[in-house]
Regions:
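C-terminal cap of thioredoxin/glutaredoxin-like
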Residues: 4-5, 24-36, 179-247
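Bacterial N-terminal signal peptides
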Residues: 6-16
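Bacterial signal peptide processing site
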Residues: 18-20
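Hydrophobic face of amphipathic alpha-helices
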Residues: 22-53, 57
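Soluble non-cytosolic domains of exported or imported proteins
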Residues: 28-32, 43, 106-109, 137-141, ...
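N-terminal "domain-start" segment that seeds a small globular fold
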Residues: 63-87
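A short beta-strand-turn-helix
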Residues: 78-95, 120, 208
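Structural alpha/beta surface segment adjacent to cysteine/selenocysteine redox centers
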Residues: 98, 103, 109-182, 212-217
């Protein structure tokens, strides 16, 4: 083993940017020995390849998360201080949770159960900011615009419509959006009139641009303090929330 470590360490030193002295270089025979020892070790312990791949993926995710956190800091005002964004929960919150969501996203439907539960448990301490982020087709975009238009009729109207839309599965053609809006207590005629306001479509476009800046490639996507949680990972969401509440 000592011979193996000595040869292997020399091999790594040779591969570095600084060349070692000539008398420290490996001979051809030593190089062959290193290759054979490494080969035999891998053949006898093939699981090390899987371990290496897992570690490689972990490091890649860490780099991606760090890059996204840097982007979050750069886009702080657009994320947290846009008055156009719908909000739910505490007016003076201890914790703010941001969710990028799409009404056609089945995982958003799962995550909505956690959102509702948190609002029931910590509605006086937690505030949600919803980023309407339609990425699943034209009907997703129409539903997002409809929800933002309905918000002009009141935050409670928006909340009812938001959860009605998110619980609906399948396609969202115009007729179905209107039906769901009516069920949620929305004045559909007024909603449709407000949907023609360029300010609302501009808001949706701005959120899309923000999502691209943050490299949000799927929904749901949560920002909880310094923790980014892609997907409907209930355990990760709850852990991040508890860290913020108890931090």
């Amino acid at each position: 083993m000592t011979r193996f470590l000595t040869l292997l360490s020399c091999g790594f030193f040779l591969a570095s940017c600084s060349a070692p002295p000539a008398d420290a270089q490996l001979s051809d025979q030593d190089r062959d020995e290193v290759r054979e020892i490494v080969r035999e070790y891998i053949l006898e312990n093939p699981e090390i390849i899987e371990e290496a791949l897992v570690e490689l993926q972990r490091r890649a995710r860490l780099r991606e998360s760090q890059a996204q956190l840097t982007a979050v800091n750069a886009q702080y005002d657009a994320i947290y201080a846009d008055p156009r964004d719908p909000r739910l929960g505490a007016e003076d919150p201890q914790v703010v949770i941001v969710e990028f969501m799409d009404y056609k996203c089945s995982y958003c439907r799962v995550a909505a159960e956690w959102v509702e539960d948190v609002n029931e448990r910590y509605g006086d301490r937690v505030q949600f900011i919803f980023k309407e982020y339609p990425i699943l087709g034209p009907d997703s975009r129409e539903a997002a615009i409809a929800a933002l238009a309905a918000r002009r009729q009141g935050d409670d109207v928006y909340a009812n419509f938001h959860y009605t839309l998110i619980r609906a599965s399948g396609a969202l053609p115009s007729e179905r959006i209107d039906q769901l809006a009516s069920l949620a207590g929305v004045d559909v005629a007024q909603m449709r009139a407000d949907m023609d306001d360029p300010a609302i479509t501009a808001h949706v476009d701005d959120v899309r641009q923000l999502g691209r800046a943050l490299d949000v490639t799927g929904t749901p996507f949560f920002i909880i303090g310094d923790t980014l949680v892609p997907g409907a990972n209930g355990m990760a969401l709850e852990r991040a929330l508890m860290e913020e509440l108890n931090g």
